């Protein structure tokens, strides 16, 4: 596992995704007072300066949730601070989700059937290195084993492959949220709304994952997720630790939640709980399978 590649990728990805999320957020003019009118199945929001692109009822409700979340996350009561926190939260969420999907698709672990089994279909890439994700092939979207609630009328009205991909990706995240809620669930309405655009473009995040992190790194074990988490937060961790004041609530995860490699966990367990068990139960045969246990002289 090439950690220098992972570090460079994660640090660059943070900036890339935060910019993309901020651009998406700005399209909804969440800091504007807008009047609401209804036109058929759509909601029109406007004032004397701007008019938003018509929203569906679902999008309107997600925008409302987004505004509430901005207010809730603000650390100093200002709307701008709340926006910054939402951008950070959303960017990390999509980083984590897409990286997790990449890990699962390369290890044939994507649980996309009703009984949560893999169909061997990639979501972000193609096994034959084609330029389009396998999941978007009509034969895969209509696979009877695929447990996604796809509205094909809605899907076919989307004007380009990036929009179609975002639609399917959100459905996949909803599916995975029933299985791995720690990564794919939570307060997701506004997270879905702020999914960055053009993920499949040459300079999009999905393309960055595929091209910059060799597949072999994802096949060396799940530790890659932990390293990417630590490197993603590296700059904020360094900044927070160099400050001399009291940590803000939002800074605490950066300085306390560090990735612990598998061997360190085993070392700690074998030489603490493991040692206690052997000393009190005499089950010394266990030691033969412990790689990091330090025997007494």
Identify the meaning behind each predicted range.
Residues 1-297:
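Preference for the N-terminal adenyl/adenosyl cofactor-binding alpha/beta module
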